[in-house]
Amino acid sequence: MGKEYNIQEALKMAIQAEKDSMDFYRRASAATKNVRAKKVFELLANEEVGHLKSFFDHYKGGDFGDLKSFMESPPNKKNATYQALEKAISGETHEQAALEIALKEEKSCIEQYSVIVKDIIDPLVRAVFQKVVKETENHYALIEDEYMHVMKMVDKSDQDIYVRE
């Protein structure tokens, strides 16, 4: 039997996690000089907004106020991931460090949501979590590709060139 009574807690946790991720990617984008990495961070921030909205639609609590105000609220600077980013920004290789932090966070999110989805009874809420897991897996692949590019490794955009030569 699933833990339906915990669904609102799971949604609350997911909403806060997505807000933290959105803030992280916005801050990373603002601090990044590499045009390609900046675009990746902007794309990820916008996708986190979509995740946040999806979870918010099913959340019945009033802890966050209205969606617009919550999204515009200042970032949680006590969040460990945000603090790690701020520390990384002071270094010369902050794009690399930000991508490494992002990889860890996306992987953690995939693991956490995959565990939660197993206990969700409501098919609509379950579908939201499943969709977000798939999209987060795509985020991980995108970040991994950008990390390889920043580190001057072969990435997906270069693979065709190397195969043909």
What are these regions (language model features)?
Residues M1-E165:
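Iron-associated oxidoreductase/ferritin-like identity signal
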